[in-house]
């Protein structure tokens, strides 16, 4: 029986151990997509205790706590920080098979030096030890980033953001990690959402464009895109809950947009036409600036109306959708490619049934003398666990070139989540090692080591250059 989480954790063969310890563990972290708050990085936020650092914004943990029967008071309610931590610790031994068990213990081990497993029995001791480390070692936001050897962070930002904290970070010569905004025009895309008209008003104000038509909207967004670009933005992000392509005319889209500004009801077909038209327009702008477009496909959000009204979005009430995506996604990419305006693009699917869809879709639009121009993104959200990552790696390697893969992202709101890069790297090395051990690939350490370091760092560092 193997010891829990020893130095060879998840490394099941000798080749995997060599690849991880000699290659994967040696390169820095390039975290090009996350949801960290730029203000907390710029102000070097100091955490008051482990609960603030660990549980305040982690909907993965919140979902598990609800499933264990823990009252909402101890999850997002007003219970004390220690009581919230204690309830989480009480649940921990029962998370067998869940990646939260692995992530949590990696975080305790790497950032706090805690070797014990977390449980009701060890809760008090671990609470005191971690809080002492936070205080004595000054575990601020920047310190955690430095400890994890992170060299690049891509935050997720709204077009109306002033990016003041990104600017502040650029002026900090003592902080070596490059923190850059990502352009996420989510609120401009969701024409059926409550508050859409008010948001367009805010966009008009910050862009100094009177927005009365769809062309005005595109102009305003392009002004903000240029502002982001001037402040280091290389990456954009779109959430596509449903991918539905309809043919449309410019006149039709303008009419739909004006209807929304007038407060009229927009039906689902009109909303789909509008979002696709805007995505295609923005995609062309991204291509002109050599920016990367990320498409996150297939989330079914805010399923629980009662809890959405009580707590809000991004609180652990989202799940996997099962809509068809292949045809419509193909048409969107092709519309951009027809004019040679398809930007570098990363496609993520939340439903693993779509792994092979994306694994083959990316091959349709490669080219432009760019290795891996169109990427099948890493296992996302409900798939960023061992089985989900392995399925993504297998689909990509069998249907494309995993050697050109830009690797892992945290996609997280937590400063402790950088251990997910270690988790990914161990799984990657084990996957490649198994191919060698089973005789499916020769043991050529130099090329294998190069592939591993490329996937873990070098491919992304190259891909996200202007």
From Swiss-Prot:
It catalyses: D-glucuronate = D-fructuronate; aldehydo-D-galacturonate = keto-D-tagaturonate. Pathway: Carbohydrate metabolism; pentose and glucuronate interconversion. InterPro entries: Metal_Hydrolase, Uronate_isomerase. The gene is uxaC. The keyword Isomerase applies. Belongs to the metallo-dependent hydrolases superfamily. Uronate isomerase family. GO terms for molecular function: glucuronate isomerase activity. Its EC number is 5.3.1.12. It comes from the Bacteria. Keywords: Isomerase. One of its GO terms (biological process) is D-galacturonate catabolic process. This is Uronate isomerase. Disulfide bonds: none annotated. It is an enzyme of class 5 (isomerase). SUPFAM superfamilies: Metallo-dependent hydrolases. The keyword Zinc does not apply. NCBIfam families: PRK02925.1. PANTHER family: URONATE ISOMERASE.
């Amino acid at each position: 029986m193997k010891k829990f989480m020893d130095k060879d954790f998840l490394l099941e063969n000798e080749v995997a151990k060599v690849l991880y310890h000699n290659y994967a563990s040696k390169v820095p972290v390039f975290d090009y997509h996350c949801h960290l708050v730029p203000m907390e990085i710029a102000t070097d936020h100091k955490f008051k205790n482990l609960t603030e650092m660990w549980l305040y914004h982690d909907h993965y943990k919140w979902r598990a706590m609800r499933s264990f029967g823990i009252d909402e008071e101890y999850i997002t309610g007003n219970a004390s920080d220690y009581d919230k931590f204690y309830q989480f610790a009480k649940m921990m031994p029962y998370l067998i098979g869940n990646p939260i068990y692995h992530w949590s213990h990696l975080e305790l081990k790497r950032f706090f030096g805690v070797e014990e497993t977390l449980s009701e029995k060890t809760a008090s001791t671990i609470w005191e030890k971690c809080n002492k480390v936070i205080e004595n070692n000054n575990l601020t936001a920047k310190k955690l980033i430095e400890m994890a050897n992170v060299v690049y962070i891509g935050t997720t930002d709204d077009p109306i953001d002033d990016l003041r904290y990104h600017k502040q970070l650029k002026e900090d010569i003592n902080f070596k990690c490059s923190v850059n905004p990502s352009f996420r025009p989510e609120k401009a895309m969701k024409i059926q959402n409550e508050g859409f008209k008010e948001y367009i008003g805010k966009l008009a104000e910050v862009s100094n464009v009177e927005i009365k038509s769809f062309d005005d909207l595109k102009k305003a967004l392009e002004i903000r895109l240029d502002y982001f670009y001037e402040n280091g933005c290389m990456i954009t992000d779109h959430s596509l809950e449903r991918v539905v392509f309809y043919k449309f005319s410019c006149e039709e889209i303008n009419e739909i947009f004006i209807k929304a500004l007038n407060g009229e009801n927009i039906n689902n077909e009109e909303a789909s036409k509008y979002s696709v038209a805007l995505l295609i327009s923005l995609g062309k702008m991204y291509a002109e600036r050599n920016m990367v477009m990320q498409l996150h496909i297939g989330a079914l959000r805010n399923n629980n109306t009662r809890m959405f009204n009580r707590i809000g979005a991004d609180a652990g009430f989202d799940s996997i959708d099962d809509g068809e995506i292949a045809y419509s996604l193909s048409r969107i990419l092709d519309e951009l490619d027809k004019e040679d305006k398809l930007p570098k693009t990363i496609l993520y699917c939340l439903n693993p049934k779509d792994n092979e869809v994306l694994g083959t879709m990316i091959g349709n639009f490669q080219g432009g003398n760019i290795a891996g121009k169109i990427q099948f993104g890493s296992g996302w959200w409900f798939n960023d666990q061992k089985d989900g990552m392995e399925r993504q790696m297998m689909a990509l390697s069998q249907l494309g070139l995993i050697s050109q893969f830009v690797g892992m992202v945290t996609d997280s709101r937590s400063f402790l989540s950088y251990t997910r890069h270690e988790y990914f790297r161990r799984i990657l090395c084990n996957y490649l090692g198994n191919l060698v051990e089973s005789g499916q690939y020769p043991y050529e350490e130099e090329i294998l080591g190069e592939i591993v370091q490329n996937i873990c760092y070098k491919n992304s560092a190259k891909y996200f250059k202007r």
